[in-house]
């Protein structure tokens, strides 16, 4: 039973590699596997990369050793997700085209170029959609990771060992129930305050009772923020309450 040739498989893989190299460059930046592809390197947008997002929220272009290590791990994780999706896309597209060609030969019919192009386009669009999900999730993680490190430094300069933090919620029709539950008070207006030490660094599972640096779902848009001592909220906005005020304790009936 005749399927597609090795040469055809290689062409499919090259097509997928070109797509993923372009997308990875926009998200991760210039990584070793892309350095010889000057045609796409010059089309990149550095201000959209995870490194830029991380450094912008960190507030420093010269990160400390531990901050550089955090960024390195962030980029490494993103590359692993991209590599996994790349391999999956190659396998799925090759299998679908190969199956189609074999079915046509069994019917004594010539494979249609139009049908093959349709299979290719369908799988490329699917890959782009999945990549977008990865990009959104990893960008949220980069933004909040950089902010968490920046908050830690600012708090330390004020003599605060475990600072109060909250999440700025994007409130629209896409705001999920989990973001409302963990990021807002019952009045649905006042941000819920947490200690930085309570924020998880792994991925969130629905029903868990603490927020996460990486967000509460793959398309989470909530951003971590610092609440300085003495500050609280009025009508959902940060406001000075008074010397000695601790919003974390106040929300829990401890003040």
List PLM regions with ranges.
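N-terminal leader/targeting and assembly helices and adjacent pre-domain segments
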Residues: 1-132, 139, 150, 226-255
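Acidic, glycine-rich two-metal-ion catalytic cores of nucleic acid-processing enzymes
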Residues: 125-237
């Amino acid at each position: 039973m005749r399927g597609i040739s090795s040469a055809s498989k290689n062409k499919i893989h090259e097509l997928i590699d070109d797509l993923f190299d372009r997308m990875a460059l926009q998200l991760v930046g210039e990584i070793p596997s892309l350095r010889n592809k000057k045609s796409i390197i010059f089309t990149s947008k550095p201000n959209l990369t995870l490194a830029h997002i991380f450094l912008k929220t960190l507030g420093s272009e010269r990160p400390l050793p531990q901050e550089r290590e955090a960024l390195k791990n962030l980029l490494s994780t993103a590359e692993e997700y991209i590599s996994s999706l790349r391999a999956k896309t190659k396998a799925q597209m090759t299998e679908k085209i190969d199956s189609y060609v074999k079915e046509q030969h069994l019917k004594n019919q010539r494979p249609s170029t139009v049908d093959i192009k349709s299979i290719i386009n369908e799988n490329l669009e699917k890959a782009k959609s999945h990549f977008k999900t990865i990009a959104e999730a990893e960008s949220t993680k980069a933004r909040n990771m950089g902010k968490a490190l920046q908050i830690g430094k600012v708090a330390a300069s004020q003599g605060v060992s475990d600072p109060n933090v909250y999440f700025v919620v994007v409130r629209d029709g896409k705001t999920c129930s989990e973001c409302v539950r963990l990021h807002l008070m019952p009045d649905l207006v006042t941000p819920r305050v947490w200690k930085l030490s309570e924020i998880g660094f792994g991925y969130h599972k629905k029903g868990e009772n603490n927020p996460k640096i990486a967000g509460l779902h793959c398309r989470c848009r909530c951003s971590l923020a610092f609440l300085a001592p003495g500050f609280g909220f009025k009508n959902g906005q940060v406001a000075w309450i008074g010397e000695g005020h601790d919003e974390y304790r106040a929300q829990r009936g401890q003040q």
